[in-house]
Amino acid sequence: MKKLNFLLWATLVSLNSTAYAEVKSFTPHFPKFYSSATTRKADNQFYALGEAKFLNGVAVPFYGITAQNPIEDGLLFKLDAQHAKQLKLLALPEVGVVLVPRNWQDIQANAGANGTGFALIMSPDQKQAIKLYDSSFCVGCGLPNATLYFPELLKESLENEYGGFKDPKNLINIVHPSKKVAFFSYQIPQVNNKTHGIAKYDDEDTFNYKEIQVTLDKSQQSLVGPILNFYNATH
């Protein structure tokens, strides 16, 4: 009798636990906007990007569409007011957002077909620079670059015939606050100030590697910390 009661209880629990997962019948329907025309006009604006050319030579107009910014209510990062006067925020293709000196305008940014992102932003005199890279899901792009700051990855990279990097002269000073994050600095010959940067990797699903290098002169050294701290907090 006890066994029967237990089975009955187990059955009821099973029925109750599955009652929350509803299976609905498919019904064909035409899609509808869930926002008003006024809201769509304000949030989703067209901006021209030129032309997109296809393999057979034909071209069509190319447009981007704006969307509501999920961070417009404020970034979860505190920035000193004095530093804010000297900085601006850039959104870079396949790289993300980064703080750079406000008067910098010279930039090269590329997005690869495999999702990789690269950007180089330079001062007007091209003597200061911020360089960024994100390997996206390209393991062969990210893993060899990561070996410079994470030597324990070199064996895996070589086994996969990706190659890698070493620092036999100990030119780079590296601190690992955690296993997959590296803070680094090094001196470039004929450059007055050191380059500081952050390298990170994530190998939970596939291998992703990202890096920022910041080289600023003495007049802008106070901005190195905010730029790197912001990158570390948002990437």
Segments (PLM) and residue ranges:
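Extracytoplasmic
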Residues: 84-85, 93, 101, 116
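Sec/Tat signal peptide C-region and signal peptidase I cleavage site
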Residues: 17-21
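Proline-anchored loop/turn motifs at beta-strand termini and strand-loop-strand connectors
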Residues: 93-109
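Sec-dependent N-terminal signal peptides
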Residues: 4-15
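Conserved polar/disulfide-associated segments of primarily extracytoplasmic proteins
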Residues: 23-68, 109-235
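Short, compositionally biased strand/turn segments
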Residues: 71-91
